[in-house]
Structure formats: structure tokens, C-alpha cells
UniProtKB/Swiss-Prot annotation:
GO terms for cellular component: cytosol. HAMAP family: RimP. Its main location: cytoplasm. The lineage of its organism: Bacteria, Pseudomonadati, Pseudomonadota, Gammaproteobacteria, Pseudomonadales. This is Ribosome maturation factor RimP. It is found in: Cytoplasm. One of its GO terms (biological process) is translation. The keyword Cytoplasm applies. Belongs to the RimP family. The keyword Cytoplasm applies.
Amino acid sequence: MHEGVQVSSKLEELQALLAPVVVALGYECWGIEFSAQGRHSMLRVYIDKEGGVLVDDCAIVSRQISGVLDVEDPISVEYTLEVSSPGMERPLFTLEQFAKYVGEQVKIKLRSPFEGRRNFQGLLRGVEEQDVVVQVENHEFLLPIDMIDKANIIPSFD
């Protein structure tokens, strides 16, 4: 099986397991990242709530998630669990999240090249069906959501 497919299905499994726990605690599960890199694997869970997330919020969610992970044991390698807010360089995971930030500057990295490139930085113009529309200089790109490896808002300090 292709490694990207394994990571993708692992993310789906973790999302299904952990999102209900986060929601039950009164937070939004903004997204989950899992990078399997041998002994330095990382499970990062982003939480959000109206008014912002405090360190205490992260600690509460981390304790609950740790308990679930200990019982369910979905990850076979050693890993570090990190619970955090999305922050200023907010990662984007879903089409709904992209739609919410239309008009913002974004940085997107694809899993594989699209039109000869993997990295795009520009204006988020919209969402069309399963594509994210990004304007880079004078060219619009329709990037399929399933090709996006990582996407972040670029904060503006105007």
C-alpha cells in the first residue's frame, strides 16, 4: 500500500476516534495531523472555541484524548501527542474551512505536483465542488482538496 494512503486512512481513523471526544468537551476539533517518522512521530490535534483557546483548554483535551488513545491504542509506533489552538497561521483541513477564509492569503503544499509545482502561495479565491481556488499572481489554480498535504493562512498585520 502507498504510504500516503496509509497515512490518509490513519488520519480518518484518528479523526473518527478523537473528534467526538473533543466535541463532547465543548470544543471544535479543527483538525488532526499525524506524521509517522519512526521514533519521532507526532500526533497533533487542533482545537478551537468561541473566544479562543487557552493553555488550560489544551491540557483538559490532552488528558481526555490520552486516555482514549491508551485504551484504543490506534497508533503502533511511539509518538508525541500535542494539543493546540490553530494559531495565527491557522491550518486548513476541510472545504468548509477554506470557504470560511476566502479573501485571505494562503500557503498550500500538495502531495504531488500539479501543473508542474507542489507549492502555492496566493489569494484564496473560493471553493468549487472539491477544488480550492487560489490566485497566484495573475493565474488561478483549482487545486483538488484530496491533493492538498498542508495548507495554512498567512497572517496579515495590516
